[in-house]
């Protein structure tokens, strides 16, 4: 992945910041090639060619719409299962489909320790604990970390019956245009566009990669700070040094934002170990940085059934 691919891929993130809400990273497919071209300094045609290349490689294969779990009165929890053999992952992926509430799993290498991060929804901590016990039974090692809450901003909208119908249509056909969605729901284009944009603006749902998309070769870098007050200066130094860096938003990785977070997080290219290690050394040398933590994404699996069933419960069947 060259710097231009990385810059274009970053431009698909709302505000240029990465967010991981209940699984894959958020993207904004509405961003026109013209706007991306202005950001990265190439022609519109050049952007389209690069996007087509990323699609052929599988990184932008399909799109999905994920509803906000708060719409259904549930929160997201995450637990990690240790992985000792690469062959264990495929079986765990299959078994997770049998666990109620599992919505996403990511195979990661976290500072040399391989583990499967399992995201699932739950009404409360006691239900989360029971699902954690089920996950332990699926673990080849018989181990799982205690489920912990994974913070996501709540939806700001109380959906109307029409909102549910629009959300249902968009979820079933994420590649459809707004006009096609409006026809499916049986409303005007103007009403369809207004409802569609309102759902996104109030965080009732968001766009992400399709379930069959390949994991982009990125590493999550978390920089521990000596003093939270150093956060802005460290972030500025990263930009001044010209390091390839996609900042993770404060509300983007499962931790409720605080006024002065004690770390800076970002995504960096990980397809070249040599380049990555060079970047890690530079991060560690930044004034105010006391720790560099790396997490690599090796693969993932989506489980959309739970969300699909909950949305369908709010949409009367047509006869």
Question: Locations of the language-model features?
Answer:
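A compositional/biophysical signature of low hydrophobicity enriched in polar/charged and small residues
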Residues: 1-319
């Amino acid at each position: 992945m060259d710097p231009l691919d990385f810059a274009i891929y970053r431009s698909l993130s709302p505000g240029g910041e990465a967010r991981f809400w209940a699984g894959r990273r958020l993207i904004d497919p509405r961003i026109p090639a013209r706007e991306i071209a202005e950001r990265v300094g190439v022609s519109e045609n050049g952007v389209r060619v690069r996007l087509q290349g990323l699609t052929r490689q599988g990184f932008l294969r399909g799109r999905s719409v994920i509803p906000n779990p708060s719409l259904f009165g549930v929160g997201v929890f995450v637990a990690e299962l240790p992985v000792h053999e690469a062959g264990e992952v495929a079986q765990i992926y299959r078994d997770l489909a049998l666990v109620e509430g599992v919505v996403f799993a990511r195979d990661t290498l976290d500072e040399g320790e391989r583990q499967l991060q399992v995201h699932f929804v739950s009404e409360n901590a006691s239900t989360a604990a029971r699902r954690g016990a089920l996950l332990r039974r699926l673990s080849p090692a018989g181990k799982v970390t205690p489920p912990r809450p994974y913070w996501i901003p709540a939806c700001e909208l109380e959906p109307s019956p029409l909102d549910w119908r629009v959300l249902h249509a968009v979820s079933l056909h994420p590649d459809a245009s707004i006009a096609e969605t409006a026809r499916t729901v049986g409303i005007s284009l103007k009403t369809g566009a207004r409802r569609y944009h309102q759902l996104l603006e109030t965080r009732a749902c968001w766009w992400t990669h399709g379930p069959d998309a390949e994991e982009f070769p990125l590493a999550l870098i978390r920089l521990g700070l000596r003093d939270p007050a150093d956060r802005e200066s460290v972030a500025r130094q990263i930009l001044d040094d010209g390091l390839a860096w996609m900042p993770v938003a404060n509300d983007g990785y499962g931790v409720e934002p605080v006024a002065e977070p004690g770390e800076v997080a970002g995504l960096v290219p990980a397809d070249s170990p040599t380049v990555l290690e060079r970047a890690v050394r530079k991060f560690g040398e930044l004034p105010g940085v006391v720790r560099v933590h790396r997490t690599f994404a090796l693969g993932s699996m989506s489980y959309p059934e739970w969300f699909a069933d909950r949305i369908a419960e709010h949409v009367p069947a047509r006869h």
